Amino acid sequence: DGKPLLMVYLGTPTFITDRNPLEVWNDDRFTVRYVTGFITEQSSLRDSETLESIYGYWSWEDRGAQTFAVNQETKQPEAMTIVAAYRAQGEPGDADYIPASGRQNGKIFREEWARARLIGVKTALVVSWNEFVIGEQIDEERSKDLEPNTVYGDEYYQLLKEEIKLFKHK
């Protein structure tokens, strides 16, 4: 749009679940997008089959299958989150259980980038750089951090550069 992007975080879970938050507040000086986390875990915010964000919410992180946002005016795919790995959510047997997915030597990261290209989103939100939160970083395999470290060296930094190049030239 040529306007500055203003991302408004409404918390996780979000408190606006019954309508497009742009109906609550918008500002024509900006491209306003509302953000929440883990749309995969907020069933009222996504289509269960397509995983499209119902009200155009951008997700700053997802566990499990990637959700994606669609521009509410143009109806074009707009944004998707990409992670290298994720921890489990819930307990096996629970209806909302999401099993963990390790890095698998970069396979998960590459697959998530491939899905972003396939869906055709304009914006990829890459999680995470330097997040040293114990609950989220279970071990090296399920850590979503991409910064160079003693375990992987700069492997994921190089992979990130490679995938960004592919994404920009899709």
Segments and roles (model prediction):
Residues D1-K170:
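Glycan-processing catalytic domains of CAZymes
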